[in-house]
Amino acid sequence: NLGDAKYFAGHSLGEYSALATSGSLDFKNAIKLLNERGKAMQTAVPKGTGGMVAVLGIEIKEINNLLENQSNYKCYIANDNSNGQIVLSGLNSDIDKFIETLKTKKIKNIKLPVSAPFHCKLMNKATSIMRDKINNTNFEKPKNVIISNVTGSETQEIEKIKDLLIKQIENPVRWRESVIYMIKNGVTNFIEIGPGKVLSGLVKRIDKTINVNTINKLENLNNIKLND
């Protein structure tokens, strides 16, 4: 019974799924907002000018040091996914310069096949577009506690939820901190619902002792195993 879950959390657009599942946002409005959000983010920068790169094997503190010690390009942390997996956004010209820096330091990285530099300041036009759309959409108080991508902690107040959804567009997804917050507050079982099992892998990377179940097809519902 999903209603028994202590927390709901989603990664990036998955936060809208979490809000819909918790009863805060009805399904129709969730789809409508996501459609508008997608269009707004695609038009925030000229097509083909922005990109993202995943940096593997180093921690966020080291990434911040690299970014602080350069002045000829500007990149932004977009996703703090897990220990040793950080994603950055920026203009492609800046991303390519950053990749060269990573190569000289022999730091593993993967340039991602994305259409825009999500979750960074380059999305400010999308924020402006979505502010009114989110504020003019009806939200209810969620039945379950929501973990915000922006803060990595819980929220249940309707106006705060709206404000954080707006800020989410150009702020990093603090997934690692979100998972740690839930674990520190007593969560021992995580259930990922949706295609694939990327988030399950991230949770296990953050804490190998945590029990994780993945539901990406109906038959998975009968195979869930929870720790006491």
Regions found by a protein language model. Name each.
Residues 4-5, 135-228:
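Acyltransferase/transacylase module recognition
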